[in-house]
Structures are given as structure tokens and as C-alpha cells.
Amino acid sequence: MIFHMYAVILQTTYFQADMRTIDNYDVKIFTDNIEEKAIEQIRRLMSIDVFSGCKIRIMTDVHAGAGCVIGFTGNLGDRVIPNIVGVDIGCGMLVQPFECSGDIDFHELNQFILSSIPSGRDIRSQEGLIQLQPYMERYQEAKELVKELRCFRELKDVKRLYKAAGTLGGGNHFIELDRDGQGRMYVVVHTGSRNLGKQVADIYQKQAVKNMFGWDKLMEKQAGMIEEYKAAGRKAELQEAIRELHNSFRMQRPPVPAELCWLEGQPREDYLHDMRLCQRWAQINRSIITDLLVEYLRAKGNISGTQEALARERFESVHNYIGDDSIIRKGAISAREGEKCIIPMNMRDGSLICTGKGNPDWNWSAPHGAGRIMSRAQAFQQLSMEAFNDSMKGIYSETVSEQTIDESPMVYKPAEEIIANIRDSADISCVIRPVFNFKAAQ
């Protein structure tokens, strides 16, 4: 029934993408289905200097986020707000198509995931690190990336971060096996930079707040004072002079809320450097998880073909990052002309495999999913397990529970709405529907 619904939508030609604009700004919102809170977040973003004069495009799956609207795309300028990219830096989805041989034992697969791929808040034990021996080169790279962060000294529990490579996380992160209309199978892994990205985002957002209170100017004065006193041979007086400088410092009130404070100059460069390392870390994380799954299925006789052949078909779509094209994408993916991408709908209806159209009016982007219409708190309060179980009939999942009800299909916008509104951004190649789903029970 789901495939029939998609087929009807894909064949129709009269759908036009709904769109809203905001007066006096170069903003387009590619849907009419947007709550007032999200509109207010967009207006607030446009009212600050960071995005004045920027071309802002808001994707179809837009919804209000923590301080910043989800579905945001815009140009990177001389100022950057770490909170725009957010705490899950480099989060995305990796897709591995394959030809399936024989029947997959889904219960055994679920047990393998539980024993080999930590999820939720869990990380790898010492024993779990042994499972990464075939991927030790990537694991070591992930470890070095952490060490190369310019904010390294401010990180907490670094040893725990080292053990997070090859782990899934919680929330909307998942592992799926999907099937297309031709019977081809897909491993799909959705995860990001785990606690590493959160720490880096928080460190730099706090620095942005401090700098806008005037802290950076105080540090400049202090550095100048140290240089001056040393040159004059007055080192003995320096400690008292610094104390007086700090006592005389008066914080300025930032012109924006704390979550929208920005970085510029060297702090901006430091953030962008560390953000890119987190993006690479997230990419490694997805690749390790995917390879663990592929090699498990190969050992069970469910996957044939060489690693090289599989690698040629593998692709991923990242949705919380700043790309080489200097486009900020917060809950949006790159959709350059000819670029293969994936747009997930929900854990029942699966995902769209698409090819980007490279539309500059969309900032060369597409939505990263269906977009929530119900908050997690609302889902826990309003949805029943009976409805959740009914919605997942025909899909093998041992993680459909009260702990994951906030990710049930009903909390997202209807798939047909997203399909109807992305025609100018991407062509849909096929629909893949889950046959197996795993999520962490928090």
C-alpha cells in the first residue's frame, strides 16, 4: 500500500511546491506547513547582523529547534554561530546498497548489533575495542582527530571520547535494512559525532557568549599589558596590574540571546577548524558501523561481492555541517546536480533515494527528512503503544517500545507532503522501505 501511494505521487505532475516568504528579507520557506515558533526563530535569525544580506532558504521539513530553526540553509559569512550547526556536528546517513542472498535472521542481526555496536549513551568497553581490529587505522584516525582539536584542553573525559568510535547514539539515530521495489537491499546507518560534537559546539558557543560580553577584548588588553610590562622589566608588578585590569572590567550586554551569539576573527577560524574535524569523525563513525554490519551479513552468506564493488555504490548525506561550498546546512543536505542523496521519511515509510538537481534557488540543498510535527514530550504524553505497534506491522524491530515512541511514524510530517515539495530540489530515483529497524532505547 505504501509503495502504491508513492507511485501515485511520483507519477502526478500537478503538484507545485508550496512556499512562504518573509518581508524585507531574502528568505524562502519551501512549505506552508510551518508552526509559528519556527517562523519566529527565522525572523529572529534574520534580525541579527550575521545573516543580513544573506540568501536564506528553509527546507520543506522545517520545524522549531533549540534556539535555531531546523531546515536552515544560508551562506557562511565573517561571523559564525556555533549553535546554528548545532551539537551533533556532521550527523548524517550512510547508505550501502547490496544484493541479498538468502533469508536474513533478523533476531540474530539484532543480537549482533546489541553485542557489537554500542548505542544510546553507551561506548565501547576494552573488549569492544577488540572488535574494531579490522578497522584500527580508522579508529586511530578518529583518536588523532580528537587530539588535533584546538579546543582539546577544554574537552571532558577524553578517554571516553576515544571509545565512542563505531557507536550509534540515541534519539532519531538508527540502523535499518531497507528494500526497494526491485528487491534490492540497503544498509542504512544514521548517526553523527556523538558527545564529541556536543562538547565542541558547547565550548565554542560559550566562547561566543563570553566574547560578546567583551571577554576577548579583555584578553587582548591583558596580552598587551604582559608584553609591555615584560619589555619594561616590570615583571614583579605584573600580577597586581592584571588583577586591577580584571577588577575594572565591566561586561557588556550582548545584543542577541546567548544561543545566537557569534564568533569572528581567530575564534571563528578555530571553530571552523574543529567543526571540520568533527565532521570527519562522524564520517568515520558511520563507516565503521556500516562495515561491521556488512561483514556480519557477509559471514552469514547474505552479501556477496567484493569490498571494492560495494564501496563504489556507497554514499552518504550529511545534514548538520558547513560544506566546502560555504553553505551552512542545519537539518538540510547537499543536493548538487547529479549528487546522490537520501531523504528519510520515518521508521515505517522508509527513505527516498534521490539525485540532486543543483538548484541555486534552494542553496543547492534538499530537506534532510520529513520534519517533526510533534515534540518528544508531546509524543510521550499523547501516543499509545497500540498505535505505535500497529504503525510498524510488517517491519522487524525489537526496539518498538515506550522508550522509542517519540520516534514513531506519527510524529513526522506525511511522506507525501515532502515528496510533493522537493520537485525543484531533487529527482526521486526510488523509495526504500524498512524490513528491519534498530533504535536505542534510552
Predicted regions and their residues:
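Domain-length cofactor-binding catalytic modules of enzymes
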Residues: 15-44, 51-58, 64-70, 79-82, ...
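Acidic active-site catalytic centers that drive phospho-/nucleotidyl reactions
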Residues: 60-61, 88
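Glycine-rich loop at the start of a catalytic domain that most often binds anionic cofactors/ligands
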Residues: 69-77, 99-100
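A generic, well-ordered mixed alpha/beta core segment in the N-terminal half of proteins
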Residues: 84-138
